[in-house]
């Protein structure tokens, strides 16, 4: 039984989602957004660090997963996004959590089945997968998608490693 914290980083809005995994079942624990205020980037980064640190204290996750930086519309946006990711990753590292990173395409593929899914499709599938009464807001849904992607990736690796070491009729499978 593992608790996974997924994060969708942003310099203005950072989404988070927490799921608990029991066998093949994924249970929703919580989600939301850290909304930063002000124009001072160092202050916004501190707000992200403090927010993620508080979520870690509240939910006590075993694992941390975050979306990788994608190619932004301009260099300044990409740099700010990278710094927001860094603040979240440092919060996880301070809490001694293992950090996993996934591309947007990997996340959408794990949740929807196609790497080119739209935000609305991700929201809908997260609602269905986690049996939520309503679709979560976009940033929180993306963060829950990161957590679900991490869970599925781990399940696949466990299955593959199990098969690779299982000997049947004198052959390895």
From Swiss-Prot:
How the cofactor is bound: the record states: Binds 2 Mg(2+) ion per subunit.
Q: Which reaction does it catalyse?
A: Endonucleolytic cleavage at a junction such as a reciprocal single-stranded crossover between two homologous DNA duplexes (Holliday junction)
**GO terms for MF:** crossover junction DNA endonuclease activity; DNA binding; magnesium ion binding
Quote the EC number: 3.1.21.10
The family database entries (InterPro entries) matched by this protein are listed as: RNaseH-like_sf (IPR012337), RNaseH_sf (IPR036397), X-over_junc_endoDNase_Mg_BS (IPR020563), X-over_junc_endoDNase_RuvC (IPR002176)
Q: What is its main location?
A: cytoplasm
Q: Which GO terms describe its cellular component?
A: cytoplasm; Holliday junction resolvase complex
Q: Name one Pfam family in it.
A: RuvC
Subcellular localization is given as: Cytoplasm
Q: Which cofactors does this protein require? A: Mg(2+)
Q: What top-level branch of life does the organism fall under?
A: Bacteria
Q: Which residues bind Mg(2+) 1?
A: 8, 139
**Active-site positions, per UniProt?**
8, 67, 139
Biological process terms from the Gene Ontology for this record are: DNA recombination; DNA repair
Listed A to Z, the keywords are: Cytoplasm, DNA damage, DNA recombination, DNA repair, DNA-binding, Endonuclease, Hydrolase, Magnesium, Metal-binding, Nuclease
Binding residue positions for Mg(2+) 2: 67
Family designation: Belongs to the RuvC family.
* Its job: The RuvA-RuvB-RuvC complex processes Holliday junction (HJ) DNA during genetic recombination and DNA repair. Endonuclease that resolves HJ intermediates. Cleaves cruciform DNA by making single-stranded nicks across the HJ at symmetrical positions within the homologous arms, yielding a 5'-phosphate and a 3'-hydroxyl group; requires a central core of homology in the junction. The consensus cleavage sequence is 5'-(A/T)TT(C/G)-3'. Cleavage occurs on the 3'-side of the TT dinucleotide at the point of strand exchange.
> HAMAP family per the record?
RuvC
Assembly description: Homodimer which binds Holliday junction (HJ) DNA. The HJ becomes 2-fold symmetrical on binding to RuvC with unstacked arms; it has a different conformation from HJ DNA in complex with RuvA. In the full resolvosome a probable DNA-RuvA(4)-RuvB(12)-RuvC(2) complex forms which resolves the HJ.
From the Swiss-Prot or TrEMBL record, give the protein name. Answer: Crossover junction endodeoxyribonuclease RuvC
Species assigned in the record: Shewanella sp. (strain MR-4)
The taxonomic lineage of its organism, from the top, reads:
Bacteria, Pseudomonadati, Pseudomonadota, Gammaproteobacteria, Alteromonadales
């Amino acid at each position: 039984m593992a608790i996974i914290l997924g994060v969708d980083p942003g310099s203005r809005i950072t989404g988070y989602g927490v799921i608990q995994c029991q066998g093949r079942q994924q249970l929703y624990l919580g989600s939301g957004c850290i909304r930063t205020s002000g124009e001072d980037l160092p202050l916004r980064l501190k707000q992200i660090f403090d927010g993620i640190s508080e979520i870690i204290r509240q939910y006590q996750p075993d694992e941390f997963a975050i979306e990788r930086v994608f190619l932004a519309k301009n260099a300044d946006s990409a740099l700010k996004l990278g710094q927001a990711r860094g603040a979240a990753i440092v919060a996880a590292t301070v809490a001694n959590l293992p950090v996993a990173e996934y591309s947007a395409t990997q996340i959408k593929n794990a949740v929807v089945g196609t790497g080119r899914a739209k935000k609305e499709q991700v929201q809908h599938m997260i609602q269905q997968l986690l049996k939520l009464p309503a679709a979560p807001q976009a940033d929180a849904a993306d963060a829950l998608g990161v957590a679900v992607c991490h869970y599925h990736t781990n399940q696949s690796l466990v299955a593959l490693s199990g098969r690779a070491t299982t000997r049947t009729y004198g052959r390895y499978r």
